[in-house]
Curated annotation (Swiss-Prot):
It comes from the Bacteria. The gene is rsmH. One of its GO terms (biological process) is rRNA base methylation. InterPro entries: RsmH, SAM-dep_MeTrfase_MraW_recog, SAM-dependent_MTases_sf. It is an enzyme of class 2 (transferase). Keywords: Cytoplasm, Methyltransferase, rRNA processing, S-adenosyl-L-methionine, Transferase. Its EC number is 2.1.1.199. It is found in: Cytoplasm. Its main location: cytoplasm. Belongs to the methyltransferase superfamily. RsmH family. The keyword Cytoplasm applies. The lineage of its organism: Bacteria, Pseudomonadati, Pseudomonadota, Gammaproteobacteria, Pseudomonadales. This is Ribosomal RNA small subunit methyltransferase H. Specifically methylates the N4 position of cytidine in position 1402 (C1402) of 16S rRNA.
Amino acid sequence: MTDSTLRHITVLLDEAVEGLAVRADGCYIDGTFGRGGHSRLILHKLGPGGRLLGFDKDPLAIATGEALAAEDGRFVVVQRSFAELGDEAVVRGISGQVSGVLLDLGVSSPQLDDPERGFSFLNDGPLDMRMNPDVGVSAADWIATAEEDEIARVLKDYGEERFAKRMARAVVQRREQQPFTRTADLAKVLTEANPAWEKGKNPATRAFQGIRIYVNNELGDLERGLDAALEALEVGGRLVVISFHSLEDRIVKQFMKRQAKGEADKLPRDLPIIPKAFEPRLKLIGKPVYAGDAELKANPRSRSAVMRIAEKLR
């Protein structure tokens, strides 16, 4: 690992922490600690009585978090998915008392830039793609056993790849001769199977995204994490989510919109009083936030980021 794989420019740093409306004595959750960019700014805004709980699946992120926890007693980090933040909040006695939850989705720069993690098609490395290399099935093992139809479905549904069937067929044909173990090898086969290259985008981009999302169950974790965050928040607490592709943002947008609408439309129209259980649970705060020109210039990876903010009503 090189120094470059340890560097990470936090996307929408100031905007996200501002969206949390941090109180000095509040209790906050950073569901995606990463290299601690957001967490450090939250801690800077917290007073002596404030608390911050960080989550991450990545062992290297946990090592960084433990070093920060050793420096600052207000911070604790746990090696769990943010999908499990509800359980952790119950264990720690803070369920329904959390002042804000931040989720910065996707893969961090250190993960992408470290060839040994197997996320990138630009640098050759073991074909892994797991956020936590000690848990679950690697990309190589999944590709070695998955049916052609399943591979095509994953590339189409999670990678939004137009040529999913063609790519899946090429992968299966090639693995019959030799198994895939390296990212460059898979990227080459996927690239050759893509007949319409998009300008400025590697032909393997969407396929790699789809496999990574599937291997890590990212969308399932997101759905669980949003539900858990809502329950963990106190009334008036903020939920801030940064997404990096349309699949994530669609889930976040629909969740917030649904919770902001409530379920009064399921009741008889002539009902004089709407029961509390059918009232909205969230209030949308402002419009979606995107990276500004200065951030886009400093960090091109921020170009696809979109941030949404909501506040708990009940």
